[in-house]
């Protein structure tokens, strides 16, 4: 009787461990497809990521790493994605493109906001404001009956020739203006992705500017979406759970990493080089000042980690998040990461998907739902400022 009881207890313990402890070979869970030629499985220093939307699904088979990233040479600063505590990556969807953040559980989310109303000015033209405010703003009509659309809390201006111009501010969205010839101009800025504490990645979506990805405490990545113009790169942030969040406000955000949200990627470093300031490839990677709550990652031997030593992994539901000190049970990929042409790769692919979940977009390695859209993860190198 005692013997059978001991056997039952031992069986229960082994079953419990199997459910909570991943396979001991988790560090070799990489895609079967090899990393592309010329990619690097090592990066000297820390870096963040910025969400870049792929223009069309039909372009996925022929799209190159540099074709979808519009760089502003006049802008010298790029803002990264942030990470929250759980390690998840989230992208907020508030009216514009904002940075990705990572929350404590490691998921990636993208928040969304409501659109603003159209105003009509005296000339009869219709204007539509594109600022990141949650409340709707009315349409204005000018003298000639045209309707103008304001892109910020500020009004649209018209110069002597009748053209309409829209100024682009780095930290806040500026209004559309009209110059003397009647043409309309619109300025743009880009914001980074952030990571919150859970490791999730969030990406806010601002019309006027793209914000960085952030990571929250659980390692999830979130990307917020607010209304702002996009011309300056903003960083991803990380919160306590390791999730990655990307805010979409007009202000530039830097990729931040907090308590538990790490990311790791393994690969074959023998055939690849390490990126550094002296390498030609580093010239394609924008630089940004690091700050609190930004998703900061390291890449060694194709293993991706955050500053909390959490693994960057694709978990059972195909979501990209940071877990640690070792990946969670059921992890699909925990290695095979690399950098090429300024983009983050998993295996031979640099295409990921942001999928709307409530107020945020989560990041996945596959198209798991109809509300998902293809994106790329642009690398931002952090420097001391």
From Swiss-Prot:
InterPro entries according to UniProt: PIR1-like_C, Yeast_CWMannoprotein_PIR, Yeast_PIR_rpt
Residue stretches in coiled coil: none
Record: glycosylation sites: 272
GO cellular component: extracellular region; fungal biofilm matrix; fungal-type cell wall; yeast-form cell wall
Keyword set includes ATP-binding: no
GO molecular function: structural constituent of cell wall
Induction cue: Expression varies during the cell-cycle with a peak at the beginning of G1. Expression increases in hypoxic and acidic conditions and is down-regulated during the switch from yeast to hyphal growth and under low-iron conditions. The promoter contains E-box consensus sequences (CANNTG) suggesting that PIR1 is directly regulated by EFG1. Expression is also regulated by ACE2, HOG1, and RIM101.
GO biological processes: cellular response to temperature stimulus; fungal-type cell wall organization
Secretion signal, residue range per the UniProt entry: 1-18
Disruption phenotype: Increases sensitivity to calcofluor white and Congo red.
Protein location: Secreted, Cell wall
Keywords on record: Cell wall, Cell wall biogenesis/degradation, Glycoprotein, Repeat, Secreted, Signal
Residue numbers marked as site, Covalent attachment to cell wall glycan: 88, 107, 125, 146, 163, 183, 200, 220, 243
Region (Disordered): 257-282
A Pfam family this chain is assigned to: PIR1-like_C
PTM entry text: Covalently linked to beta-1,3-glucan of the inner cell wall layer via an alkali-sensitive ester linkage between the gamma-carboxyl group of glutamic acids, arising from specific glutamines within the PIR1/2/3 repeats, and hydroxyl groups of glucoses of beta-1,3-glucan chains. Highly O-glycosylated by PMT1 and contains one N-mannosylated chain.
Subcellular location, principal: secreted
Role played: Component of the outer cell wall layer required for stability of the cell wall and specifically for cell wall rigidity.
Domain text: The PIR1/2/3 repeats are required for covalent linkage to the cell wall.
Descriptive protein name: Cell wall mannoprotein PIR1
Organism: Candida albicans (strain SC5314 / ATCC MYA-2876) (Yeast)
């Amino acid at each position: 009787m005692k013997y059978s009881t001991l056997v039952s207890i031992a069986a229960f313990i082994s079953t419990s461990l199997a459910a909570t402890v991943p396979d001991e070979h988790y560090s070799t869970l990489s895609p079967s497809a090899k990393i592309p030629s010329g990619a690097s499985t090592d990066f000297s220093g820390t870096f963040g990521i910025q969400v870049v939307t792929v223009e069309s699904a039909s372009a996925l088979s022929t799209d190159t790493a540099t074709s979808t990233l519009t760089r502003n040479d006049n802008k010298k600063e790029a803002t990264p994605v942030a990470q929250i505590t759980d390690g998840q990556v989230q992208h907020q969807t508030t009216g514009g493109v904002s940075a990705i953040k990572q929350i404590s559980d490691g998921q990636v989310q993208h928040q969304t906001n409501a659109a603003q109303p159209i105003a009509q000015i005296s000339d009869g033209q219709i204007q539509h404001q594109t600022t990141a405010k949650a409340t709707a703003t009315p349409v204005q009509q000018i003298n000639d009956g045209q309707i103008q659309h304001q892109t910020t809390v500020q009004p649209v201006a018209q110069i002597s020739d009748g053209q309409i111009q829209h100024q682009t501010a780095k930290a806040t969205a500026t209004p559309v203006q009209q110059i003397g010839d009647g043409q309309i101009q619109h300025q743009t800025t880009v914001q980074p992705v952030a990571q919150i504490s859970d490791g999730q990645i969030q990406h806010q979506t601002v019309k006027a500017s793209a914000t960085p990805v952030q990571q929250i405490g659980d390692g999830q990545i979130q990307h917020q979406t607010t209304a702002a113009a996009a011309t300056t790169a903003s960083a991803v942030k990380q919160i306590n759970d390791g999730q990655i969040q990307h805010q979409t406000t007009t202000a530039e955000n830097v990729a931040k990493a907090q308590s538990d949200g790490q990311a790791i990627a393994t690969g074959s470093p023998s055939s690849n080089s390490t990126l550094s300031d002296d390498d030609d490839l580093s010239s394609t990677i924008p630089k940004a000042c690091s700050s609190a709550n930004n998703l900061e990652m390291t890449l060694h031997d194709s293993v991706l980690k955050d500053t909390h030593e959490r693994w960057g992994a694709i978990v059972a539901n195909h979501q990209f998040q940071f877990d640690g000190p070792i990946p969670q049970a059921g992890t699909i990929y925990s290695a095979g990461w690399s950098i090429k042409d300024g983009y983050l790769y998993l295996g031979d692919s640099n295409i990921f998907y942001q999928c709307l979940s409530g107020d945020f977009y989560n990041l996945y390695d596959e198209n798991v739902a109809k509300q998902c859209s293809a994106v790329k993860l642009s690398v931002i190198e952090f420097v001391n400022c």
